[in-house]
UniProtKB/Swiss-Prot annotation:
Induction: Strongly up-regulated together with costimulatory molecules such as CD80 and CD86 during dendritic cell maturation. It is a single-pass type I membrane protein. Glycosylated when expressed on activated dendritic cells. This is CD83 antigen. The lineage of its organism: Eukaryota, Metazoa, Chordata, Craniata, Vertebrata.
Length: 205
């Protein structure tokens, strides 16, 4: 098979691949993330959820035991509560969502023998959080804020320099005036006294 044909088949497969489903939820509300992995209702899978982070790292969210055996799992998380409810098998319920919960999640189903793993991804978008609004506002006015800070620093530096210069001007003129007065004083030698010089009289014989 030629390389061009391989690239064509890969592009076709990529275009036909199903897009990752996306779930949107308002801030502070609960959300139920479905596991998009294909599964057999007759097989009691064990499910695990991970959140995909930047750099390829993964963080375990809520490990879940067999749903089909009627087990229920609940965990308190830092950014909310995570449930593994029985209403929707293998789903992940996140309570009290925040902006930190936004991201891509992946569920993995493992059969009892541990020989086959099925996985699926879902994207969660949490909107309307106060922290998110502040971040968007900062990004919108970031250039103006940076310019304002630069102007404030410039004027503070100018004021400090002016105050220091005025202080130096108020101190040093006294020394310069005294130096000028000393420069114009007459210099006299302590060993020599000034007096009238009288010529000696000579008598003619």
């Amino acid at each position: 098979m030629s390389r061009g044909l391989q690239l064509l088949l890969l592009s076709c497969a990529y275009s036909l691949a199903p897009a990752t489903p996306e779930v949107k939820v308002a801030c502070s509300e609960d959300v139920d993330l479905p596991c998009t992995a294909p599964w057999d209702p007759q097989v009691p899978y064990t499910v695990s959820w991970v959140k995909l982070l930047e750099g390829g790292e993964e963080r375990m969210e809520t490990p879940q035991e067999d749903h089909l055996r009627g087990q229920h799992y609940h965990q308190k998380g830092q950014n909310g509560s995570f449930d593994a409810p029985n209403e929707r098998p293998y789903s992940l319920k996140i309570r009290n969502t925040t902006s930190c919960n936004s991201g891509t999640y992946r569920c993995t189903l493992q059969d009892p023998d541990g020989q086959r793993n099925l996985s699926g991804k879902v994207i969660l978008r949490v909107t309307g959080c106060p922290a998110q609004r502040k971040e968007e506002t900062f990004k919108k006015y970031r250039a103006e804020i940076v310019l304002l800070l630069a102007l404030v620093i410039f004027y503070l530096t100018l004021i400090i320099f002016t105050c220091k210069f005025a202080r130096l001007q108020s101190i040093f003129p006294d020394f310069s005036k005294a130096g000028m007065e000393r420069a114009f004083l007459p210099v006299t030698s302590p060993n020599k006294h000034l007096g009238l010089v009288t010529p000696h009289k000579t008598e003619l014989v």
